[in-house]
Amino acid sequence: MVSVTRRSLLLGVGTSAAAAAALALGGCSLGQAPTRIRMACGEQGGTYVQFGELLRDALTRAGTTGLEVVTTGGSVANLELLKHRDAELAIVLADAAATDAQNKVAIGRVYQNYLQCFVRRGGPIGGLEDFPGRRISIGAPQSGAALTARRVLTALGLLDGADAVEVSELYLDEAMTALETNAVDAIFWSGGLPLPAVQSLETEVELVDLTSALPALEVDHPGMYTLAAVPASTYGSAESVRAIGVSNYLLARPDLPDDVAEALVDVLIGDAAQLVPEGSLGVQYLTASNLIDTSPIALHPAAQRRYRQLYG
């Protein structure tokens, strides 16, 4: 596994675009699957990396192509890696992907993310009414969580004006430490259920219901966000908590070889049960009818053909 930081991204990861592409696809003749492809995922301790590792293992079992899991800040960083040819695949939140639907294609819609806002149980925040003036980490720099959280806070009138919160962008490990040490009052995270890093916290946490932002979000971003629920006991709560859901897309560069795109479709459908992290409670989209719903991002032509071959 390799890690890409904002600094290394801005420096081009030490290679030109052409050299990066040659490295990833080196040793392959035209029409053959590359020996290894790179998938931009997310932060250690999050569900993007979990999914990337499971997909890597599934491709290894299938004997089709190797996959290198790249840790990043999240969706926005992943889009930059695709754009600059420093990754062949990326997992990206649908709202982040929709900010620029060009120069990328989709392999499929894979699972639902839940925008989660964690606070200390018994702390100063019991609900949204306690947010004004509080210190909030909205997610890592260049993460999809930060993008979605800013939209939610804007919809709630908490990003500007007299009720504005104090915003910071912390990586997951930093955010967890800050929450435990009272350096922040709440942290946002967008991911599957449960968030693995929460389970190792010594501090008890609970979720804040953010769904009063949904009507305003629907006006500004129609069809992008849905009402979801975090099941009871996910984080020790006796009751389920309403949440904001947004889809995740597995994206690729348009020049991803056809046979690789087809192999990915085969694994997503044929090995679906092995692509769900152990203990996962969230919504999965690993069926043909759900995988193909990647609007406004077009499916990779070879992936689309493969779905049709398999399911008409």
Show the residue positions of the predicted features.
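Bilobed "Venus flytrap"/periplasmic-binding protein-like clamshell domains
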Residues: 34-62, 113-181, 293, 297-302
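A structural signal for short loop-to-beta-strand junctions that line the ligand-binding cleft
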Residues: 102-110, 136-137, 233-242
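Pocket-lining segment of extracytoplasmic ligand-binding domains
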Residues: 94-97, 160-251, 255-256
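Bacterial signal peptide processing site
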Residues: 29-31
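Pocket-flanking alpha-helical
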Residues: 52, 68-105, 173-179, 193-201
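Extracytoplasmic
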Residues: 34, 64, 77, 102, ...
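Segments of small-molecule ligand-sensing domains
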Residues: 241-312
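N-terminal export signals
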Residues: 2, 8-27
